[in-house]
Amino acid sequence: MTAPSQVLKIRRPDDWHLHLRDGDMLKTVVPYTSEIYGRAIVMPNLAPPVTTVEAAVAYRQRILDAVPAGHDFTPLMTCYLTDSLDPNELERGFNEAVFTAAKLYPANATTNSSHGVTSIDAIMPVLERMEKIGMPLLVHGEVTHADIDIFDREARFIESVMEPLRQRLTALKVVFEHITTKDAADYVRDGNERLAATITPQHLMFNRNHMLVGGVRPHLYCLPILKRNIHQQALRELVASGFNRVFLGTDSAPHARHRKESSCGCAGCFNAPTALGSYATVFEEMNALQHFEAFCSVNGPQFYGLPVNDTFIELVREEQQVAESIALTDDTLVPFLAGETVRWSVKQ
């Protein structure tokens, strides 16, 4: 990586956690990812969810159809785990290079997760098959019991689900997605080479005070929810350390403005347009730009056993204002950091 004062040149990054939705929303948001990233792990929580090879192939084609000419982008598809999923279907998709990984949503943990897994025991045959064939498990790590406080759900998941699972299936490769707590940062750092994590830009840049003090900011509301500043700091320190089993996963999750700005708003930040510059800002603030390229472009492929991208992009350090909104067919999207001045952006 070369780092003159105003330009950062890095190997083309990948996004290891992305929501593209479907229909008009898909067509609107895909270019914001495909112009920057070489690959992205695409989440399967559509309605209905992507649970078959056939559905994944069809969804992949809809994504590719939305990629503008001149963009070189490969969507990496995932299978949505359910209590009734056939292990043979999962293995077939993996062997045919349709499924790159499988996604575990605890039932009702987040958007379109009502079909999710009710207990680990219910999907043990599937997980055992994944361990056998070397297929990564991507985990939304929150318990969803009604009596557990929303700010405690990730920490409780580690002790009650994640650790027992990894003790039982010791060879299973696991990505602890969008970690938000010191508990998770410590757990991943102390884990072995079969455990990795992704972190979003919002969880590195903000804590729950930013979302709640002086008025509720619905465009910072995502799941897992922003935590207190000691957790934010632990995440920042983890990425700044150069730890190689943590990598870029934006969890970019678009919702139309009226679904975010409502009396019962949806969870998710549409950060695809601004995420890479946001990460660069954090690494610069932490005096860790020497680790930025690995976080964006090397650590993920290394964990997944994939080659790194062979092209490069440049970020430029000059102030730019983020658009207030992005047109959607009959509504608008509000991007992460809308209307704000940002320090780093991708050089066009």
Curated annotation (Swiss-Prot):
Cellular component terms per the entry's GO annotation: cytosol
Modified residues (N6-carboxylysine): 103
Subunit architecture: Homodimer.
Keyword annotations: Hydrolase, Metal-binding, Pyrimidine biosynthesis, Zinc
PANTHER family: DIHYDROOROTASE (PTHR43137:SF1)
Residues involved in Zn(2+) 2 binding: 103, 140, 178
Presence of keyword tRNA-binding: no
Binding note for cofactor: Binds 2 Zn(2+) ions per subunit.
Protein name as annotated: Dihydroorotase
Chemical reaction(s) catalysed: (S)-dihydroorotate + H2O = N-carbamoyl-L-aspartate + H(+)
One GO molecular-function entry: dihydroorotase activity
Role: Catalyzes the reversible cyclization of carbamoyl aspartate to dihydroorotate.
Residues forming the catalytic site: 251
Positions bound to substrate: 19-21, 45, 140, 223, 255, 267
GO process annotations (BP): 'de novo' pyrimidine nucleobase biosynthetic process; 'de novo' UMP biosynthetic process
NCBIfam families: pyrC_dimer
